[in-house]
Amino acid sequence: MPPTKRFRIQAKNIFLTYPQCSLSKEEALEQIQGIQLSSNKKYIKIARELHEDGQPHLHVLLQLEGKVQITNIRLFDLVSPTRSAHFHPNIQGAKSSSDVKSYVDKDGDTIEWGEFQIDGRSARGGQQTANDSYAKALNATSLEQALQILKEEQPKDYFLQHHNLLNNAQKIFQRAPDPWTPLFPLSSFTNVPEEMQEWADAYFGVDAAARPLRYNSIIVEGDSRTGKTMWARSLGAHNYITGHLDFSLRTYYDEVEYNVIDDVDPTYLKMKHWKHLIGAQKEWQTNLKYGKPRVIKGGIPCIILCNPGPESSYQQFLEKPENEALKSWTLHNSTFCKLQGPLFNNQAAASSQGDSTL
């Protein structure tokens, strides 16, 4: 008789399958973590799967820091903590960690420990192709999940094109801002000047499709604590810009109805995007501090809020001789309103909101 072939596996990544294994994922993970190997464990992922016959199976991806040589076929046997039963796995070297991880992930009932290790075979894809990977990334539920898929399955692209991948993923997975919840109902503002109310009614009082193209913006000047910010932010979905301009995808959204620009120095706005913003211009480009230039969809008006004074008043700023041409343009593209008092009734606000201020 020919000699019996000895069991021997030499691998850095190991794929284990435990048929008819009644252990929970957590019990299996604890026991596998306790197995002594000649190389440190880096990552373990375990999936529990019910086969057609109703029997539970466990699938395990084990990644190590370096290659190990396994000659003990019983090394990965698991033991039931409640009865006299041993569970012996099928043991294979994992040629493509990404393929095995995808297989283990397929039913979703998983547990993992450590950090998944990208290997060179993942770059060649095994059964993965670039189109498969990018299709999977597009179907991901979040930016983070999409980038992780590409990191695991297309590591060359991830390393060499990370900036482009991140920029594109941010655009694809950009979510609408969480709606801002007004502290006070719009009905609280009972002293809104007629020109402000007319401006708001003409824009927010009609269907979006019926709104005029490049609707004029409005510049509201008034003392602090007159309620102008709360009023402006209570009208609908908006971008809120204060202090400085940040058009990154984290803070500025295209799919809103208007912009609120609050306490932005007019000198600063003149150097940046005065005409783009106040003129509700469409499809304009801005440079980002981090990342490539971004094209802003635009086409929405602004409510600009400012305080009186030579450094903050937009009206005083435009009266300067060097701003004569800008003043003429701004008067054609916006409405000015100077508040004479609070936009709310002090007594009514006090009785309904206690010590709160608008």
From Swiss-Prot:
<keyword id="KW-0540">Nuclease</keyword>
<feature type="binding site">
    <location>
        <position position="107"/>
    </location>
    <ligand>
        <name>a divalent metal cation</name>
    </ligand>
</feature>
<dbReference type="InterPro" id="IPR022692">
    <property type="entry name" value="Gemini_AL1_REP_central"/>
</dbReference>
<keyword id="KW-0235">DNA replication</keyword>
<feature type="binding site">
    <location>
        <position position="49"/>
    </location>
    <ligand>
        <name>a divalent metal cation</name>
    </ligand>
</feature>
<feature type="short sequence motif" description="RCR-3">
    <location>
        <begin position="103"/>
        <end position="106"/>
    </location>
</feature>
<feature type="active site" description="For DNA cleavage activity">
    <location>
        <position position="103"/>
    </location>
</feature>
<dbReference type="GO" id="GO:0046872">
    <property type="term" value="F:metal ion binding"/>
</dbReference>
<feature type="region of interest" description="Oligomerization">
    <location>
        <begin position="156"/>
        <end position="176"/>
    </location>
</feature>
<dbReference type="GO" id="GO:0003677">
    <property type="term" value="F:DNA binding"/>
</dbReference>
<dbReference type="GO" id="GO:0016779">
    <property type="term" value="F:nucleotidyltransferase activity"/>
</dbReference>
<dbReference type="GO" id="GO:0005198">
    <property type="term" value="F:structural molecule activity"/>
</dbReference>
<keyword id="KW-0547">Nucleotide-binding</keyword>
<keyword id="KW-0808">Transferase</keyword>
<dbReference type="GO" id="GO:0005524">
    <property type="term" value="F:ATP binding"/>
</dbReference>
<dbReference type="Pfam" id="PF08283">
    <property type="entry name" value="Gemini_AL1_M"/>
</dbReference>
<dbReference type="InterPro" id="IPR049912">
    <property type="entry name" value="CRESS_DNA_REP"/>
</dbReference>
<keyword id="KW-1048">Host nucleus</keyword>
<feature type="domain" description="CRESS-DNA virus Rep endonuclease">
    <location>
        <begin position="8"/>
        <end position="116"/>
    </location>
</feature>
<keyword id="KW-0511">Multifunctional enzyme</keyword>
<keyword id="KW-0067">ATP-binding</keyword>
<dbReference type="InterPro" id="IPR001301">
    <property type="entry name" value="Gemini_AL1_CLV"/>
</dbReference>
<feature type="binding site">
    <location>
        <position position="57"/>
    </location>
    <ligand>
        <name>a divalent metal cation</name>
    </ligand>
</feature>
<keyword id="KW-0238">DNA-binding</keyword>
<dbReference type="GO" id="GO:0004386">
    <property type="term" value="F:helicase activity"/>
</dbReference>
<keyword id="KW-0255">Endonuclease</keyword>
<dbReference type="GO" id="GO:0006260">
    <property type="term" value="P:DNA replication"/>
</dbReference>
<comment type="similarity">
    <text>Belongs to the geminiviridae Rep protein family.</text>
</comment>
<feature type="short sequence motif" description="RCR-1">
    <location>
        <begin position="15"/>
        <end position="18"/>
    </location>
</feature>
<keyword id="KW-0945">Host-virus interaction</keyword>
<keyword id="KW-0190">Covalent protein-DNA linkage</keyword>
<dbReference type="GO" id="GO:0016888">
    <property type="term" value="F:endodeoxyribonuclease activity, producing 5'-phosphomonoesters"/>
</dbReference>
<dbReference type="GO" id="GO:0039684">
    <property type="term" value="P:rolling circle single-stranded viral DNA replication"/>
</dbReference>
<keyword id="KW-0378">Hydrolase</keyword>
<comment type="subunit">
    <text>Homooligomer. Interacts with the replication enhancer protein (REn). Interacts with host retinoblastoma-related protein 1 (RBR1), and may thereby induce the transcription of host replicative enzymes even if the cell is not dividing anymore. Interacts with host PCNA. Interacts with host SCE1 protein.</text>
</comment>
<feature type="region of interest" description="Binding to RBR1">
    <location>
        <begin position="143"/>
        <end position="153"/>
    </location>
</feature>
<keyword id="KW-0479">Metal-binding</keyword>
<feature type="binding site">
    <location>
        <begin position="222"/>
        <end position="229"/>
    </location>
    <ligand>
        <name>ATP</name>
    </ligand>
</feature>
<dbReference type="InterPro" id="IPR001191">
    <property type="entry name" value="Gemini_AL1_REP"/>
</dbReference>
<comment type="function">
    <text>Essential for the replication of viral ssDNA. The closed circular ssDNA genome is first converted to a superhelical dsDNA. Rep binds a specific region at the genome origin of replication. It introduces an endonucleolytic nick within the conserved sequence 5'-TAATATTAC-3' in the intergenic region of the genome present in all geminiviruses, thereby initiating the rolling circle replication (RCR). Following cleavage, binds covalently to the 5'-phosphate of DNA as a tyrosyl ester. The cleavage gives rise to a free 3'-OH that serves as a primer for the cellular DNA polymerase.</text>
</comment>
<feature type="binding site">
    <location>
        <position position="59"/>
    </location>
    <ligand>
        <name>a divalent metal cation</name>
    </ligand>
</feature>
<feature type="short sequence motif" description="RCR-2">
    <location>
        <begin position="57"/>
        <end position="59"/>
    </location>
</feature>
